[in-house]
C-alpha cells in the first residue's frame, strides 16, 4: 500500500475532493490543488480528461469536454503534477478511463505516474475481474489501484474489499443523470 494514502486515512475518514484537470485551465487546476490542500483535503483526485467519460454525470462530462477543447493532454497533466510536487506532498490519485491508459501505454503511463509522485489510480470502467492487467503494473511501480464497489451482493463487496489497495471507492448509485438538474 502507498505510504501517503495510508497516512491520509490514519485519523479515520478522509476528505477527498475531485477536480477535472484543465477545467478551466491547467494553471487554475494547479492553484485549486493548493487551495484544496490548504482547506484540509486529505487526498485529492485528479481527473484526466477523456472524450467519453461514461461513468460521470453531466457536470463532469462537460468539464472533460472543456478541458479537451482547451488542449489538455495526458502529458500536460503529468507536467502539471511535476509542478505541484515541487510545492506539495498531499496524496493524489488519478481518475481516468482505461482507454487513456491503454493509448498512452499501460507500463509507460503507470511508470510515469509513479515517477512524478502520484499515489494511486482509479479506473471506473475496469471491472474488478479485469483489473489484473493494470494491478500488476501498479504494484510494480508502487501505485495503488483503487477498487470501486457499486451496489452489489454482500459476497462481492467482501471479495472486492478484501483485495482492495489504498482505499475503496464506494459508488452510491448506478444511476447517471443524463440531463441537467438543479444540482449541476
Residue ranges, per PLM feature:
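Anionic-ligand binding region
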Residues: 135, 150-167
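Active-site beta->alpha loop and helix N-cap motifs at the rims of alpha/beta catalytic domains
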Residues: 64-122
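Catalytic beta/alpha-barrel core
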Residues: 119-130, 144-152
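Conserved, mostly hydrophobic/aromatic
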Residues: 47, 113, 160
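Conserved small/polar residues in nucleotide/adenosyl-binding loops
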Residues: 177-184
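Glycine-rich, proline-tolerant flexible connector loops at the mouths of alpha/beta enzymes
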Residues: 45-72
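Active-site-adjacent beta->alpha loops and helix N-cap segments on the catalytic face
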Residues: 2-3, 55-57, 74-79, 103-104, ...
Amino acid at each position: 500500500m502507498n505510504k501517503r494514502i495510508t497516512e491520509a486515512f490514519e485519523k479515520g475518514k478522509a476528505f477527498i475532493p475531485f477536480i477535472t484537470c484543465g477545467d478551466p485551465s491547467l494553471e487554475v487546476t494547479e492553484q485549486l490543488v493548493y487551495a484544496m490542500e490548504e482547506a484540509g483535503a486529505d487526498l485529492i483526485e485528479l481527473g484526466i480528461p477523456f472524450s467519453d467519460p461514461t461513468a460521470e454525470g453531466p457536470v463532469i462530462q462537460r468539464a472533460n469536454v472543456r478541458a479537451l477543447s482547451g488542449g489538455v493532454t495526458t502529458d500536460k497533466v503529468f507536467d502539471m503534477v511535476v509542478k505541484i510536487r515541487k510545492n506539495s506532498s498531499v496524496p493524489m490519485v488519478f481518475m481516468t478511463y482505461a482507454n487513456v491508459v491503454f493509448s498512452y501505454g499501460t507500463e509507460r503511463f503507470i511508470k510515469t505516474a509513479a515517477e512524478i509522485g502520484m499515489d494511486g489510480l482509479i479506473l471506473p470502467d475496469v471491472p474488478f475481474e479485469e483489473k489484473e492487467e493494470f494491478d500488476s503494473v501498479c504494484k510494480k511501480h508502487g501505485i495503488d489501484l483503487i477498487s470501486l464497489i457499486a451496489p452489489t451482493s454482500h459476497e462481492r463487496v467482501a471479495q472486492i474489499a478484501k483485495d482492495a489497495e489504498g482505499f475503496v471507492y464506494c459508488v452510491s448509485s448506478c444511476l447517471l443523470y443524463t440531463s441537467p438538474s438543479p444540482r449541476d
